[in-house]
Amino acid sequence: MKKRCYILPSILFLFFFSYGRILLYLQKDIHVGFTALYAPTLKDIGIGILILLVCYALSKANLIASYVLALVLGVFHLANVEYIYALDHVVNLKDITMASDKEFIAGTLFHVSFPVYSILLMASLMASIFFLRKLPLFKLKTKRYNLLAFAGLLILYLVIAVQSSGDWKNGNFVSASIRNSVALLTFNEEALTDYPPDIERQINTSQQLKDGEYLLNNHTGKKNILMVVMEGIPGAYSPANQEFLNIPNDIKMSSLDKIKDHSLILPNYITHNNQTIRGMYSLVSGDYPKMDASTPKAYEYLQKDPSYREELLPKLLKNRGYNTAFIQAAELEYMSKGDFMTAAGFDTVIGGESFRNPYVPFGWGPDDKAFFEQSQKYIDELNGKGKPWFAAMLTVGTHHPYAVTDDYAKQYPSRKAAAVAYLNEALSGFIDYIDHSSFAKDTLVLFVSDESHGVNDQPYGSNWGVFAAYSPDIDGQIINDGVYGQKDILLSLLDYADPDLDAYTTGRSVFRKYTEDSPILFASHYNGDIFYSTEKGTVYQVDNSGQLYSLTSENGELFSSKYGRTSLSDSTLKKKILTYKNYIDKSSAGDQKIVITKDKEIPLTDGGEAVVTDGQFITLPAESYVDIQVDYDASSMAAADWLVLKFEDYSGHKSVRMIDKQNRSGKITFRFYNEKVGYGYAFNLKTALHSNDYSGADKAIRINRITVEFSKTVSAASPSPAASAGMSAGPTPSASSGPEHVEVVDMDAGNE
């Protein structure tokens, strides 16, 4: 009887482990029948049993190690529950290294969506190991045999995981994470480089502006353009989309009803991939972002000689007499959006550091209400410079863990729903500001999204963006039901702003109605799926296992309440789609050096810490030395001042360097060896001033350039004596005798 009680915690763990799926269905209000639920639940139970056996075998060899493994697997399961709840995707292991995950995990720890469930699952798992160890499940005599049993079970689990479904609705969460990660890391792109000569036409369009009927017949002259980009908002939240497509949603952005009488709506609007920097690049470039998680095209754009860069939307509008400004809530250093937007042609670039006194403290930047209210000053200043003008705004409050107070969140079923409601209120006030402004009658306003944080029961809901245009030029509400994507915005705004634009220009404008469809591609780098459509209502999907499917909407639109899904064996079509993906993903930089930022002046205050750069999302080549070089000048420091330069990446490399009067200018290189291809690599660089100077003089550090360089062999330079692994407590003597300090920090020699 006593031994039977020993298995009770294991039974409870299996129940809680499999109940996570049901919990998500209930909280996300997804209705499924028993037939759709029992098979995935049985998989959860089977994987749960295997996890218990793996931990049991390890406990016989090393009890502490088994608890550590159980902790990792339990937290990984709970992280997937949070990720699915927030973004409708499982965690991809490559994303663990991303800077965004640090904020995601930190936010989750303070705002766990299912605290009781999390505690019960972890407690039952730990108790299972404790009590199962008392049972003679494996009668193995030596530690060696127990380790072999553990290794065999672990390999079996990994094999099952790799072969399982990558969709959380059909497979176990942890297994799906492992499967998707392995699939993305082993994707073979080398065999898909036979590009047809007309590939641009095949992935974009052969249509010309003149092929579409212009829908804004009342539009005259050059008007101001304001583009409001809302973090992660899917098209499912648009009241007009819900009504037109007959797809109800518990979340509705009623503020968009205020523009109903003078609006143009795109119900079939695509965001081409996940991640803000990719969406923003597509909006201002008229180009696809990469369909995978490799180095964003925005960084590759920065590497090009300025005289050879393609002219992007801000520059093209500036050439037509527009004053331009980019205003975002997040700090400009993150993802180097400040550098990219400046290179893109914006005259003025404003980031989160320019916003004060938020209503809700939030790590990513000002909350949406504070952002919209304080942005009015910058828009008024831009308007005062003369017309016409173009401004792009980017919110951040609907990014996980969401900029709302706990009391506000309690009024809604989830923090995400609360954050969208808060954005809705803030946007309503901002629309009122526009309506009462002096520029209201002369301005086109676009409400769009940078990406989509997912929609329940939508096979590509992570690519359903919102688009609503608002202008006195628009009489009533126009529904343009064609399929458009972020890449179409550039030409659309030129079509709007420039009446002399050549009608024979190749491309599509959202302000025109076309009788024929055009090709479009989109993807989710969370799970590696790629989608391709040439006809509205039919989408081809290649999942990360290489299986080809046809998705057919019931209503004939791109988005529907029901879809038919058919497995196809058309190898020619599959190869064509993957070839398109590879063509879009190929690097345009060509060299082995990436410039992260340059010519940046960072003001310093005593005791204050400033972010120099963060969130780069770079692809690291295999078997290469990685050199991250910081070229700096801190000559404005007083003799008694010293600086701390803190380097940390999400692979565990850390270093703290001291800068004082002896090494106030120079180059510090952080070097490490990278064994395997790494996607989404990011590092954080901060600086802090320690001053004994009370003169009140302004002080700053100038970052001449930060570069990331790859090489197969280590350069001739070797780590300086000052680049030891130990962390210094204060200023250290310079490692070079000349006026410019040169230091190479070997990150593989130690973490500090």
Label for each model-derived stretch:
Residues 1-181:
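Transmembrane and membrane-interface helices of multi-pass
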Residues 175-505, 512-525:
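Soluble catalytic regions of membrane-associated enzymes that act on cell-envelope
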Residues 317, 614-637, 666-674, 706-708:
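Extra-cytoplasmic beta-strand recognition segments
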Residues 332-335, 475-606, 704, 709-721, ...:
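Membrane-interface soluble catalytic domains
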Residues 597-599, 605-608, 623-625, 661-667:
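Solvent-exposed, conformationally flexible loop/turn segments
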Residues 608, 631-668, 674:
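Extracellular ligand-binding interfaces
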Residues 624-626, 638-643, 681, 699, ...:
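Short beta-strand/loop motifs in extracellular/secreted proteins, especially
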Residues 670-702, 706:
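Extracellular beta-strand ligand-recognition surfaces/modules
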